Amino acid sequence: MKVKKETINVWGARVHNLKDVDVTIPRNSLTVITGLSGSGKSSLAFDTIYAEGQRRYIETFSAYARNFLGNIERPDVDKITGLSPVISIEQKTTNKNPRSTVGTTTEIYDYLRLLYARAGTAYSYLSGEKMVKYTEEQVLEMILDQYIDHRIFILAPLVRQRKGHYRELFESMRRKGYLYIRVNGEIKEIERGMKVDRYKNHNIDKLKVRGKDDERLKKSVQIAMRQGDGTLMIFDEHDNSIKNYSKRLMDPTTGLSYGEPAPNIFSFNSPEGACPRCKGLGVVNEIDINKVIPDDKLSIRDGAISPLGKYKNQMVFWQIDAILQKYDCNLKTPVCDVPQEAMDEILYGTMENLKIPKEVVHTSSDYFVTFDGIIKYLRDIMDNDDTSAGQKWAEQFLATNVCPECHGFRLKRESLSYKIGDRNISEVANLDLNELAEWLSNMAEGLSTNQKIIASEIIKELRTRVGFLLNVGLDYLSLNRQSATLSGGESQRIRLATQIGTRLVNVLYILDEPSIGLHQRDNQRLINSLKELRDLGNTVIVVEHDEDMMRAADWIIDIGPKAGRKGGQVVFQGTPEEMLHRDTITANYLNGIQSIQIPAQRRRPNGKAMVLHGCTGNNLKNVDVEFPLGVLTVVTGVSGSGKSTLVNETLQPILAHHFYRALKKPMPYSSIEGLEYLDKVVTVDQSPIGRTPRSNPATYTGVFSDIRTLFVGLPEAKIRGYKPGRFSFNVKGGRCETCGGNGYKTIEMNFMPDVMVPCETCHGKRYNRETLEVRYKGKSIADVLDMTIGQAVEFFENVPSILPKIKTLQDVGLDYIKLGQSSTTLSGGESQRVKLATELAKRDTGKTLYILDEPTTGLHFEDIRILMNVIEKLVDKGNTVIIIEHNLDVIKLADYIIDMGPEGGRNGGRVLVTGTPEQVADCKLGYTSKYLKLALAK
């Protein structure tokens, strides 16, 4: 292959399943890498190209610095040339810190803080009046103008609401020649030995009578300003009125003063700005009585008070019984029948000495004790228990509520009292980005000439950065939205917008499915943003399955032909136009030779339905919605329209609590009907099936237990007396003790990255020699774990206890992954299909509800076809499936559609139209109908 300076060249890539792959990627182009799930796309883009770019960057550091940067292994590749500095933008919500928001991540909030510090107008949080500040000259002029022929006193505030006798202060003032002092509003003559009550709060002001000439008045003002820390007060004897004057921002009526505004007083991550009650989080954790007493129909003896359980801690129950006896109740009385006064004492405690009879405690006399209450008991555990298990146990009884002091705005009262127009900084941060863009366009009208000059550059930067976010389809988000609540696709697009804002050039960007979670309406805006990144002088590589993205690319690399061991080859690289004339699975879907077929006849609902009333969570507008049962329902709508709020945050928690007593609270709703038609709910999301390398598809699906049972029943195992634990790599006995059942050892290299090498004893097989000697059909337990799902289906075809569970993994298109493959190496889409296969293998009654959130994430056209065939089988058995989805290939297969909108954020939250795909396509409401009509016409 001839080396060209204008290309990135990869020779002999063998990472994971790649088979000595050679590729050429044009520089300053938009390149899409596509192919089936598991074909090797991410192995090429992230584990080869990005990993090598990172390794070369790290190599420029000193050996000492490299020691702190973790393990950067050289990818298994012969050679890569033409690499630029590389930045990876993956589809992960990496920041779980509740202090991280869209505003802080994009740095837009930093500019907003600067804007309010430089152009905000301060108001008093006591009176609502505009805060003012004066120079000494201005104060002097106002005194001369307003107090002509008035007898006035000039006061310097010395003490404000502090305790003490202040004898030394009074004596110091007397020695300096001052005759009067104002104490708690009363003017007094200073006397020798004068003092006040040391245990009360006092206000003390030094007082000077106005002189007869202006020079003495000027000097008095200067002294008062200096000793009052920039503040003085004028007491007019004519009408006994007091006015406040200050060099600092001050409320002239109440005397309340603020410091000079600085950006950090608008930061909820700074002590200067954060609300003192919630420490800048906007929420506080409080004990939820509904979690402490989940079922008030039970008696206390039967476990009504959840933290106490049933009759265990005798002393506590004796104390509670003593309280109940006062109200003619006992431990067997249902909580709903216990008077509220008694429950208050049980929950919050009582200082009354409770009598516990000597017959109960088996002592010579009655026992008297006070009771602190259940709430204090829980608080003590949370505050004082050193064990994480104890604190975690107590936290299950907490509820997160809006902070009562800042009302969720996160900032101090002073910080919230600065306004531009009629909005404080938190109100602006709560606007969705469309509204924020409009506010930035109009806000300058209310600024003074000086403020406009100061703010112009800041406003320009803000408008530019907000514009980047709008261009990637995030108009429904607000700056205050927590980063932890964003989907992977949203997080990725935020990072993309941030990178466009940096205006870097000659950089290689690698993105992982940026179209995830994006409605067709916003696809073109995303593509334009990627082209803008390219046009700045960068190379953009996108791992993607989206048809529009492929057609818009400058270059396509198709990895295949299939997945796993049957993939890992470049089946095509070239332009989109050239690809249309090739015979690959991807090309056949693009040119229309293959397609996901629309069903000839759609299912009709079984006449039963689940109906939700009055949903008002997040942006939902008092939504009433019907979910017909026995059909495939797809919930659609633009990003931010309320789909996840309706299904994942309202419906799913209601069902989880109903069937499994789950504690997660649903979003607000009025009522629900139709639960009696279901017997369970299954939520299949894309979270990992395990977070350690020891977790794998075999352990998650439960088939590993069946495989171990099979091995235990073999003659050789019986002779040796082996039990199922012998074939587990997690416990001592059968595992290799050299590596602890990991199959590898970690070698510390001091000033070099740690190296993971196969265990020299078991050679990566995880088990000891004796265990591996037990074989079934010539294969050891380690050999079985190393099989792909496809191989395992053939191997266990005559074992009815094992085959069904493995066959369902094959049915969902996972025949290429290994039975013992570490869960940490599975993609989100693969993890979701492992979960789906696990549920498929279980016996169902035809009354199960399955909820899936964007199951097509990471899936190729062919993968979607296989997945939907499996889902169709579930529905054919009488079950109900609800899917949140943007992919038109899924939407067109629905029996029933619920389309939400019309926009995202505040302008969404309504059910626009419901019905079959044909009915929705014929409707002119919303954006989904337009694109669905085109999909149905293909």
Task: Label each region the model flagged.
Residues 1-938:
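Conserved phosphate-binding elements of NTP-dependent enzyme cores
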